[in-house]
UniProtKB/Swiss-Prot annotation:
GO terms for biological process: protein modification process; protein neddylation. Both the N-terminal docking peptide and the catalytic core domain must bind the uba3-nae1 complex simultaneously for optimal transfer of nedd8. Its EC number is 2.3.2.34. InterPro entries: Ub_conjugating_enzyme, UBQ-conjugat_E2_core, UBQ-conjugating_AS, UBQ-conjugating_enzyme/RWD. It is an enzyme of class 2 (transferase). GO terms for cellular component: cytosol; nucleus. This is NEDD8-conjugating enzyme Ubc12. Keywords: Acetylation, ATP-binding, Nucleotide-binding, Transferase, Ubl conjugation pathway. It comes from Xenopus laevis.
Amino acid sequence: MIKLFSLKQQKKEEESAGGTKGSSKKASAAQLRIQKDITELNLPKTCEIEFSDHDDLLNFKLVICPDEGFYKGGKFVFSFKVGQGYPHDPPKVKCETMVYHPNIDLEGNVCLNILREDWKPVLTINSIIYGLQYLFLEPNPEDPLNKEAAEVLQNNRRLFEQNVQRSMRGGYIGSTYFERCLK
């Protein structure tokens, strides 16, 4: 009995020290769930996922290339960082492409309700991808992070469209310079 206890204790110590001595490391709940989400992905033709490390499913990039709307022809890259609290906590999503958009600020923060107060563990990576794609089809000036872009969208849709096109071609809007992001 004592020998069994000491073997269990030794195994615990090895695992906490990072040694696995013949046994493989167990996947966390977040890793299992993200693996399931990735396996069940049903990406629209305008979206693509890129993994820089195929062994790390918790960090990846999403590329959205809208084929209609204000942002048609653009290429927008988002980084996803899935924490160990997933699916109880939403992933951290940032837009890496500087974009003139009411719901994405100039630092890349994204205003999407399912990434904040409306997140539920039943939502998946697929839900977030469709939510992000929808932001490009229907920007929401009612819940803005970029208040200036939201105001222009509400008051002068034509000017908003011109600003979006100028920003995607690469150019200034006011004093802010946008890198070219056309495909």
